[in-house]
């Protein structure tokens, strides 16, 4: 049904367009993608005629800095945190909207001699800043476009356009397959691109391994660094996890207030302890402790969110009030650590369906969701109910 990544790369190198699909539990859409280096008015016209979506240009942070492309908004509350910059037109264009002038703007964006002053703001081309690390960090079309360009040896920038059906609905896989057949276009998935990159590179390094006796039992503690940021993560491993059988796994995001101080605002501490105890009872398993404080927003911002909750906002509203998505965690680094440990099939201790989708997008298989529900307390009843109502957590309250 889908083509190999190598086939798509060959077409992209020839200036052709490919279709890239993301996870059905994410945006569940397909985009036309081309290399910005080879963009032509004809390609732009094809995209806007048959794609019907917004034409955007994924770029690296370096392009944005060189051309002084500021974020479109100061607080990005998009559910997928797509990093739009201010839109632009090259100063040589007139209205900037024609296929020819949009292609001109893209070509000049890549021109190493271009400066920030060479572009009018706002305009008709929408640059998007890809996360460093690409789809291994964030499984989005923005990162896929830049990754594909880099794998082709081209300038690290792409041109993308969402594919919309003639009736105005989003094109899903059956529609995209028909489109690919109609125009003889290669079609790939971000999941396959992740798998392709994983075979060629890694972002995590196993640094040190020790024996760690705990109140719950004795574990092997393995420390990891990663090349994306300065965060250090730790995996607590129990028993022989190399048998190929599904392994009990808990991916636990750091919560200083709950894990260390016993905060009753959340259920993180009890979940951590219960997971360790359950892994000990099983005789084998992994607890992966990720330094993603406050669902990824950091300790101080989590405390600021708590302050807003004291003023009547719920946990999701507080994050959004601070300019963050409800959940800023990404699972790419965690997935790489689990893969480094030799895991493929997981019995995942979680109440969060998004965590399952997040890990499965990185070539891991969740064979079973193992509930990890803690008794609610008066102080966290509202918090837990919000996680059910707004974040889709599976809890019986």
From Swiss-Prot:
Renumbered residue ranges of the record's region DHBP synthase: 1-199
InterPro entries attached to this UniProt entry: DHBP_synth_RibB-like_a/b_dom, DHBP_synthase_RibB, GTP_cyclohydro_II, RibA, RibA-like_sf, Riboflavin_synth_RibBA
Annotated Mg(2+) 1 binding sites: 27
Pathway: Cofactor biosynthesis; riboflavin biosynthesis; 2-hydroxy-3-oxobutyl phosphate from D-ribulose 5-phosphate: step 1/1; Cofactor biosynthesis; riboflavin biosynthesis; 5-amino-6-(D-ribitylamino)uracil from GTP: step 1/4
Keyword Zinc listed: yes
Swiss-Prot/TrEMBL keywords: GTP-binding, Hydrolase, Lyase, Magnesium, Manganese, Metal-binding, Multifunctional enzyme, Nucleotide-binding, Riboflavin biosynthesis, Zinc
SUPFAM superfamilies, A to Z: RibA-like (SSF142695), YrdC/RibB (SSF55821)
Protein residues bound to D-ribulose 5-phosphate: 26-27, 31, 138-142, 162
Positions contributing to GTP binding: 250-254, 271, 293-295, 315, 350, 355
Record EC number: 4.1.99.12, 3.5.4.25
Cofactors, names only: Mg(2+); Mn(2+); Zn(2+)
Binding site for Mg(2+) 2: 27, 141
Positions marked as site (Essential for DHBP synthase activity): 124, 162
UniProt record similarity statement: In the N-terminal section; belongs to the DHBP synthase family. In the C-terminal section; belongs to the GTP cyclohydrolase II family.
Function, as annotated: Catalyzes the conversion of D-ribulose 5-phosphate to formate and 3,4-dihydroxy-2-butanone 4-phosphate. Catalyzes the conversion of GTP to 2,5-diamino-6-ribosylamino-4(3H)-pyrimidinone 5'-phosphate (DARP), formate and pyrophosphate.
HAMAP family reported in the protein's UniProt record: RibA (MF_00179), RibB (MF_00180), RibBA (MF_01283)
Name the record gives this protein: Riboflavin biosynthesis protein RibBA
Species this protein is from: Bacillus anthracis
